[in-house]
Amino acid sequence: MPKRDAPWRSMAGTSKVSRNANYSPRSGIGPRINKAAEWVNRPMYRKPRIYRTLRTPDVPRGCEGPCKVQSFEQRHDILHTGKVMCISDVTRGNGITHRVGKRFCVKSVYILGKIWMDENIKLKNHTNSVMFWLVRDRRPYGTPMDFGQVFNMFDNEPSTATVKNDLRDRYQVMHRFYGKVTGGQYASNEHAIVRRFWKVNNHVVYNHQEAGKYENHTENALLLYMACTHASNPVYATLKIRIYFYDSILN
């Protein structure tokens, strides 16, 4: 015997809502709104006062827009003895990739690329780890110091590298990471993807020269040190390094 229709079905302008369209997770259609999502995405006026007073500004303090960008694209031959490159080289000018005056702030650093081995090396059974150090040089002078001049190592092993005691005030390691490649006929991994994004807020100061060189820095140069653990087998890094910076209002 069929069930009797509910009295509201006969009312004008009403219809039965299908259970398949109730936005349940099993149906797979439509957004599913719950109290947790509403609380996370609540408007700013419903958040505590500390969220409103201590918000991180898009533009660093003491700087002005627009956000500018400088890219460094290069293939590096990474050695066991280490390598260094300056990533705060910005030429003075009026473009979106230039600095207006002597001072600017590097808000963030984006490193992407890959570590790889050539055809001859990847057939050998070995593991090679490549380490990167993002270092701030507070008092740059002359040319960048080599890896062995800045870092103290045990048995000349880069994996044990720490900044020398007498240079800890000048060189500050802001971030470090590593990538690993493996060679051999079986289970080899001949390349590794590199992708890092850091917020640094590093205030760089140049002298009166216009060229973007390390020798023209006077304060807070950004250096990227690289070294590999294997002494005989070389490894390469194809990197694109982008810095996002703002000009200082003191220029």
From Swiss-Prot:
Keywords: Capsid protein, DNA-binding, Host nucleus, Host-virus interaction, Metal-binding, T=1 icosahedral capsid protein, Viral penetration into host nucleus, Virion, Virus entry into host cell, Zinc, Zinc-finger. A motif (Nuclear localization signal) lies at residues 35-49. A zinc finger (unnamed) spans 63-80. A motif (Nuclear export signal) lies at residues 96-117. GO terms for cellular component: host cell; host cell nucleus; T=1 icosahedral viral capsid. Its main location: virion. It comes from the Viruses. Residues 12-25 have a biased composition (Polar residues). Homomultimer. Binds to single-stranded and double-stranded viral DNA. Interacts (via nuclear localization signals) with host importin alpha-1a. Belongs to the geminiviridae capsid protein family. This is Capsid protein. It comes from Potato yellow mosaic virus (isolate Venezuela) (PYMV).
